[in-house]
């Protein structure tokens, strides 16, 4: 019988098979295949990294929350109409502006794992489970934890990633006596075998243990024990692919230089024909094509929006698993799950075809979206450019 430590037995987590998928290629984890982003693809975002590094805890978290749009009632807050307007020469999906606005309102009514234990939430959530408040987390440690959480998340559900992060955090506190929990210095004291044991439930855990320790050593030797602040420096780290790099850059440094395309964004944008599935064989190709037309003002939030929908239509997911990470006084822990489940079923039934999804959102009168947005189209007619979307869509979302 396999020996399970107290850290790896905190929850019963299914071990994911080592499989290679089109939308989550195993090659993203290989350090030999490095991706260099062309300079012309980068969207300028004025962020003074030295200034960010100088921010104390309170000011840093206040700034990064606003910068990433992770504010209360984010999805229920109407967008500035100008954000959704695109040039007349840009082809956009059928009824995109109206549908996107309604999607945001519907998104405000559902709770998904990404909302509790997503890339930027997981360090704070895990720390609170270990008695470390947000006020006690240094910005440098937070940035490290964002990076490590993103590295662990590849081909792994958020709930499983959160448990692996919790294992590391508790080991750093209990065994290494690190009062701050998961710091660079503490992680470097963990040997590879032990780290592999702590993260055994995530996909490719043995490989990730090696990459994490190698990455931490590089951060110590080459980046003054902090996370790199450019896309190509992040892509130079072992096991870090474009999705991980863009997400880390956004969540840790507030730099929006590209869209983070994970399996959910990849599948839904192909399903709805927001991108050409025949030309987008990898998530990075999906990212490039999506960036060609999606208004830049939406690059920050598109991942969180679609990931939330993608997670709740995954039939194999037990959404109740995420509640264990909520503190008892969190109002989200007392949600009416009967109503949530009914809403999830409606979404599952209607999201599989974009024309059907549009009609579903148009019929949801209780969403009260009349004040959400009033966009003047610069296109001649949106319907003419995407008339093919009226046909049945053959792409199906896998579990």
Curated annotation (Swiss-Prot):
Its EC number is 3.2.2.-, 4.2.99.18. This is Endonuclease III homolog 1. SUPFAM superfamilies: DNA-glycosylase. GO terms for cellular component: mitochondrion; nucleus. GO terms for biological process: base-excision repair; base-excision repair, AP site formation; cellular response to oxidative stress; DNA repair; nucleotide-excision repair; positive regulation of mitochondrial DNA replication. Does not possess a consensus sequence for a C-terminal iron-sulfur center typical of all other endonuclease III homologs. Keywords: DNA damage, DNA repair, Glycosidase, Hydrolase, Isopeptide bond, Lyase, Mitochondrion, Nucleus, Transit peptide, Ubl conjugation. Pfam families: HHH, HhH-GPD.
């Amino acid at each position: 019988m396999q020996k399970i430590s107290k850290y790896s037995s905190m929850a019963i987590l299914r071990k994911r098979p080592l499989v290679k998928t089109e939308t989550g290629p195993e090659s993203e984890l290989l350090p030999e295949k490095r991706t260099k982003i062309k300079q012309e693809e980068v969207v300028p975002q004025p962020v003074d990294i030295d200034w960010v590094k100088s921010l104390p805890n309170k000011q840093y978290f206040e700034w990064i929350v606003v910068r990433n749009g992770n504010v209360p009632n984010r999805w229920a807050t109407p967008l500035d109409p100008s954000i959704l307007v695109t040039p007349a020469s840009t082809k956009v999906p059928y009824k995109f502006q109206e549908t996107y606005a309604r999607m945001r309102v519907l998104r405000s009514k559902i709770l998904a794992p990404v909302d509790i234990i997503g890339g930027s939430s997981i360090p704070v959530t895990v720390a609170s489970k270990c008695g470390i408040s947000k006020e006690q987390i240094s910005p440098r440690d937070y940035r490290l934890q964002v990076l490590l959480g993103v590295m662990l998340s590849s081909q792994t559900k958020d709930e499983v990633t959160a448990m692996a992060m919790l294992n590391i955090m508790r080991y750093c506190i209990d065994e290494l006596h690190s009062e701050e929990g998961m710091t660079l210095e503490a992680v470097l004291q963990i040997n590879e075998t032990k780290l592999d044991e702590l993260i055994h439930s995530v996909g490719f855990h043995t490989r990730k243990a090696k990459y994490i320790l190698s990455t931490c050593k590089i951060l110590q030797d080459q980046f003054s024990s902090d996370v790199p602040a450019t896309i190509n420096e992040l892509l130079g780290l072992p096991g870090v692919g474009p999705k991980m790099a863009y997400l880390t850059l956004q969540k840790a440094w507030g730099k929006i230089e590209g869209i983070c395309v994970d399996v959910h964004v990849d599948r839904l944008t192909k399903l709805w024909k927001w991108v050409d599935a025949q030309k987008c064989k990898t998530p990075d190709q999906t990212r490039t094509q999506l960036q060609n037309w999606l208004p830049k003002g939406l690059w920050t939030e598109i991942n969180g929006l679609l990931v939330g929908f993608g997670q709740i239509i995954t039939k194999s997911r037990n959404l109740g698993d995420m509640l264990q990470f909520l503190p008892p006084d969190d109002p989200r822990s007392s949600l009416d799950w009967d109503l949530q489940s009914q809403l999830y079923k409606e979404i599952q039934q209607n999201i599989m075809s974009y024309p059907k999804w549009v009609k579903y959102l148009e019929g949801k009168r209780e969403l009260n979206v009349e004040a959400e947005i009033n966009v003047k189209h610069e296109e001649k007619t949106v319907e003419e450019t995407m008339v093919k979307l009226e046909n049945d869509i053959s792409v199906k979302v896998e579990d």
